[in-house]
Amino acid sequence: MFSKLAYDIFWESILRYHIADDVNQPFENPYDSKTIEHLLYRKNWIDTVQWHYEDIIRDPDIDPKEALLLKRKIDASNQDRTDTVEYIDSYFLHQYKDVTPQAGATINTESPAWAVDRLSILALKIYHMQQETERTDATAEHIAKCQEKLQVLLQQREDLSLALDQLLDDIAAGRKYMKVYKQMKMYNDEELNPILRKWGN
């Protein structure tokens, strides 16, 4: 099933990132650039680095100049994330281009790639919650609460994986059809962001 392929690659990316556990480490994609595996690995690596950017920027003692630079990195990462999701949707559009929708076929609330995006973020939540359950410096109460949260996340993974696979099955059978809207990110576009527009003139 596609969800298992995706999740396994996300987990591989997360584990590899945490060997060095450094947002500045070089990115090396082990998968051929012409494959969906390549896109999935890249997607999760972007998410994993951004997860840790978000940790760093919440440091109460962070230097304001460093925080500003980091905020710009987060903005760039968000754009990269969105672009990668759209590449993944392009893969699905190509996969199902010859499918004729059935009469009465319906549209989903989100495209397959945005469900993949949520699965990638969920993998990160599961990894870090699992780390919390293994802390030796935490109270028993903290460990117990995190174990409960981990069980909820694992159930969410099961449900989301099933929903994603069912969506892809429905698209392949013509019961649903894909309709993709390019995300209109406004904050990085000087034509749409009034502050950037002011500086551009």
Tell me what each language-model feature is:
Residues M1-N201:
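Anionic, Ser/Thr-rich low-complexity intrinsically disordered regions
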